[in-house]
Amino acid sequence: MPSFKIVSDFALTGDQPQAVEKLAKGLVSGLTDQTLLGVTGSGKTFTMANVIARVNRPTLIISHNKTLAAQLYSEMKEFLPENSVEYFVSYYDYYQPEAYVPQKDMYIEKDSDINEEIDKLRHAATRALFERRDVVIVASVSCIYGLGEPEEYRSFVLPLKKGQSFRRDLILRRLVDMQYERNDLDFSRGKFRLRGDTLEIQPAYEELALRVEFFGDEIERIVSLDPVSGELLAGIEEINIYPAKHFVTSAEKMAEAIKSIQAELEDRLKELEAEGKMLEAARLKQRTNYDLEMMEQAGYCSGVENYSRHLAGRKAGSAPWTLLDYFPEDFLLIVDESHMSLPQIRGMYAGDSARKKTLVDYGFRLPSAMDNRPLSFDEFKARVKQAIYVSATPGPYEKEHSLQVVEQLVRPTGLLEPVMTVKPTVGQIDDLLEEVKKRVAKNERVLITTLTKKMSEKLADYLVEMGVKTHYLHSEVDTLERIEILRDLRLGVYDVIVGINLLREGLDLPEVSLVAILDADKEGYLRSEQALIQTMGRAARHVDGQVIMYADKITGSMQRAMDEIIRRRKIQEDYNRLHNITPQGIRKAIKDINERIRSVTAEVSGPEFRPTPTLREDIARLIKELESQMKKAAKNLEFERAALIRDRVVELRAALEIDPLGRK
């Protein structure tokens, strides 16, 4: 059985060795809930990787947003390069859920845009769980949403072996049942084609395609091939082909499901008619019968997930199958930034339920649609035998349920918690400007957090007028643009960034020496003990880190936050003194803040975002792939994307020292 193997230039240091030891022992002794209280910059991800390697169990890591999940995924791949590290987040680039607004009599149809590359990574994640145990899946909270039944999915797996006798027409039928589409012209993900005695399949979870060559009904050869160039690569003795969709249903189950849906429809129509809701009854009858007709003819309909309870043969009210059900029973759960992730998991069920209830009440959906939902928090916990919560500021749930809290307060660099100062609000802007100028003179950076958007905008404008290179970071800035702005802060394009609630978890900004918190004494979500500690942590990566809180009184949250920072700083100072350590500022390549995300973005966005390869043949192959994508984009009327790809092709041709127009 393969084991986890850490590959790193670094050894465990600071508080990391004792944290790994305690957490691993806790897992071995059967502790159900543990917390790793780790400060910013203490190497929590490296600790997690070492705990996983020590206990050698399949692991699910949940992060509360896609950006942090991408960072974690990239870091885990670096620490565990010989193991299966996978990425599982929502595959929607855009998602508008189905909804009805009774006050306006307005029905909003479901609208979505699926990212094929992310869907491929999701399929790769579930495939890994069926084939090996040395698996780490980094996921967002989308992992608690419905997925196909694991055993049904497994029953559709198609094993192929060199020398095996297998009628070709049966293989084709199996592929269609597995939701693969036959297309002899457009050979892309989730499709297959047949040319004479040669069958080519593009699995839903792989970059490479497969060629299966027959001699009569015998499989003569299996080989992987590059789907763009057609180049044959490695020979394969045997392989399992997994379904192209997570929701796969046999013909028998589909027939049973249709009967079950018809029975539910009859019962629901009687209820609505008895209540005098004739319009709702007529609407439900028309919509459901149309869906049933589509399912009978095509085995699928728009919004088929709303019938998932019937298709899976589940009882009313029962929990859906999710990614958690694909893991073996002894899997380990790690919840990153648990103070944010756990409340998010808890809130998913209620929000989904309220929207669906309106659709059911007004005849847009059958009551069984309520069972197409995320797990409730209790259902989620029931599927987890052992969990580790990771946070610099554990929330109430972690504090109450953890049987062991392991602290990781000492940084490998010896850096201390920032020095804190409380200043009055009178004259705060002038004082802040002076503090900013001191940092700018030393080529250091500043983060300023306010309570309102208006205040942030005004302050940013004022600082710009005063000659300070400032940028305002607001909630409407998308993830990748936000990363660019933070990168520009590190590069010195800006010296100051002003924001509201955007300066907290997951920011790696070693150049920031000052964090200024305005209206620190306004109790609330943005100025709670947790929020203050997280915000202060942004200055903890600089050797001269300082936090200034502008307030007219010291609130309970402020006092508790300051007491905790002082406690941590004392532990750090004592450790440094005992081990004769001088704090060292972090010198991290500027690209690092962005590169971790960029590498995953390239992986999940498409070939036009990939970096330029170094080998000429790889550049030529990428050009060929891009030209295919460009034609496809133009055919789909995606002209902006086609133009973007065209520009990238011109760049690559220049790299090959070929005239952009292709003239030699």
UniProtKB/Swiss-Prot annotation:
UniProt domain Helicase C-terminal: residue ranges: 428-594
Q: Name one GO molecular function term.
A: ATP hydrolysis activity
Domain UVR, first and last residues per copy:
620-655
Q: Which UniProt keywords apply?
A: ATP-binding, Cytoplasm, DNA damage, DNA excision, DNA repair, Excision nuclease, Nucleotide-binding, SOS response
Keyword Nucleotide-binding assigned: yes
Which positions are annotated as binding ATP?
A: 38-45
Q: Which residues form the Helicase ATP-binding domain?
A: 25-412
**Gene Ontology BP terms:** nucleotide-excision repair; SOS response
Highest taxon above the source species: Bacteria
**What GO cellular component entries does it have?**
cytoplasm; excinuclease repair complex
Query: What PROSITE patterns does the record tag this protein with?
Result: HELICASE_ATP_BIND_1, HELICASE_CTER, UVR
Q: How does it assemble?
A: Forms a heterotetramer with UvrA during the search for lesions. Interacts with UvrC in an incision complex.
NCBIfam families tied to this protein: PRK05298.1, uvrb
Q: What is known of its domains?
A: The beta-hairpin motif is involved in DNA binding.
Which family does the similarity line name? Answer: Belongs to the UvrB family.
Entry protein name = UvrABC system protein B
Source lineage: Bacteria, Bacillati, Chloroflexota, Dehalococcoidia, Dehalococcoidales
Gene name on record? uvrB
